[in-house]
Amino acid sequence: TQASGKKTTYDYDKLNDLLEKSYQDAKGETSEKDVTYAYNSAGERVSMKDQTGKSSYEYDALGRITKVTSGSKKDVSYVYDDADNLQAIVYPDGTKISYEYDLNDNLVKLTDRNRKVTTYKHDALNRVTEVTRSNGTKTEVSYDAEDHITKIVNTCGSCGKVISTYEYKYNDQGYVVGETATELEAGTRKTPSWEDWYNWGDTQKETDKADCEHQEKEIQTTRTYEYDDNWELTRCTEKAEGGKKTVHNYTYDKIGNRTSYEKIEDGVSKAKYNYKYNDSNQLIKRTNAKIWGDPGTTYSYDKDGNLIQECDKTNSADPVTYEYTAENRLAVVKQGGTVLMAAMYDGDNNRVFELDNTYKWEDCYGDEVLIPANQRTEDGNSPKEQLASLVKGGSNAKGYTLTEYINDINRENTEVLAEYGADEKVRQAYTYGESGIGERVSVDKSEESSYYLYDGRNSVTGILTETANLTNSYQYDSYGNLTSGTADGVNYYGYNGESTNVKTGLQYLRARYYNAENGTFTTEDSDLGTTENPLTRNRYDYTTNNPLNYSDPTGHSLWSRIKSTAKKAAKAVKSVGKKIVNTAKKVVKTVVNTAKKAAKTIVNTVKGVAKTAKNAAKHAKQTYQSVKNRVTSSSTYQKITSRGSQFIRSVSNGVQKIGKTYTSFKSYVSERTAEIRSEVVRHMCTTTNRITDKLGKVDWNAVKKVAIGITAVTVSGLVVAATGGLAAGAVLAALPAMGGLGTAMVSGAVIGAIGGASYLSLIHISEPT
């Protein structure tokens, strides 16, 4: 029950699987359509019914998701290779992208929907060093000994010209303190057309975008960054070659609220804003210090902590209002009675439909909506019509665009695979490659494909055509405001590679929307933070005011803010366990799936990953690769356990060097030890109950026959999930081998016997040191 009186009720089955979510308003009346779930005998979700329709899910014998059907009956399929790598994704229209890997499971070749190829090269530590696209452009990446990106160079393969270069310097804590960016600016060149010659050779009327070879304007910008004792960004000083020196100053209070921002050009103050907050750290007023007596912009919130109104009194603008779902997801943004943006989410709170004010009459105008008659859910409702009903006719009616998002949920963070219009045609589709910098490779539109270029923060800085024409170039300030370039379309992918809505200026970060202008979210974080670091207790600030070194792709807690290069460490080691699972006997599928579910719970609870762990994680992948398909004896498992312990020790030693991050993580784990314990116990008990239901009486004496082991170890910022079909002796030997590391650790093992059908849950939890 929320402060406003809104209530969400959760109903579970006897195995603790969520069956239903229902919503009531403060009066106790149903406020939204219930969400219902169904599962198979292995505990895998097979369907979800919500306001967007009924979604269904299919799995293979190893519990990997192979097909997702959306509420609008659009299918996305997944294919895997023998090493458990994702081999292909099939889109709803039948097109597909395919992946090829080297012996270390590094992605080396990506073939997109149009059969265009992107290739990758890696160094000895399995880090991406080179990306070559089908249009001939190439990206080269360099690293230092601490795994920081030191240089990114984007070049045109056909002409050899450098499109952009980004160089970075770091302090002892691993934070960026210097940056040099050299970039071509997307522009135009004069080209004669038939109309030009008809008009007596006037070549001034029509232009097209210049390709890299003919692009002349190059901009070099140097930036330095300063931080306070809490590692909050306090100053950015930038100097464009031949241009002005610009200083951006930020100040904060003790809890991390921004109190002022000032922009100074060549020593002259050009802009200054002051910020005021209430006791809940909610921004309630922003004033322009350059305007005497400025009434400013005021902000109002509901009882649940959601921003509901923004009034720009300085410019006497119409108020902007915000409305939310029962689970506090942004639903509608209006200004002066006109809908700017509206969104609809599925039962997992993934954005599925969106209505945007574009002044284009392609989908709806006033009360008239162009939607195919067959686009209805099982109960006769049309999600698109529900969104379109928000548009009012009359003098304020504008043109609106309806978009359906087909999401890839088989990723760490849900990403959009394709966008459909109300006419059920694909507007654009996206291709994803190697995780980390530049993960979103290209966008495929009806006319042609375009390729994204990125800087070291994973922000989109350029867009190239198939012929290497630079059509767009972008620059951002530290908090994500677009300072150079023009945003195209309804939503564009820019700062940190995430989607920003053009009309509202809000960036969609899945659980919440981010306002780059103020450096705050529109809703409070559901994560409470840690007691050790007060800045994590601020539930509205962005990345604890350290946006250069952290991102927040989920809209949640500090540990999900660590950039993807660090997260790759956890993902790499996690895949080791998945490979061992694939060698296990399929007859124990039920236990494996339930064990994997427990591991996932721990991983989601403790997501912090120290950057210095990546190299060790990659090394561990190579170690495990050599025995991937030969895990058949106890001696082999003992070798794996030994090497795994060595890996964990190396990670433990490495992360202790990063000081504050390591200390904060220990506190985070310590506060959640009880939570982790209860979750592990719950899932292990669920395993026992599930097996008991299927196979009858448990024979505790048969535990030595065959075993399934799961070890989920969190080591100061590294989450390792390894699930495998181990012999009972190997499991028992593995626990003490991994338990004496003196670091935050959670390990669980489900040991079973197939012949006599018995299973035992073992839980070992040691407190963080």
Regions found by a protein language model. Give the residues of each.
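Short, low-complexity export/processing leader segments characterized by acidic and small residues
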Residues: 354-360, 462-463, 481-484, 512-522, ...
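A motif-centric feature for acidic-aromatic and gly/ser/thr-rich catalytic loops and repeats
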Residues: 272-275, 427-430, 442-511, 517, ...
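Membrane-active amphipathic alpha-helices
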Residues: 538, 545-546, 551-555, 564-568, ...
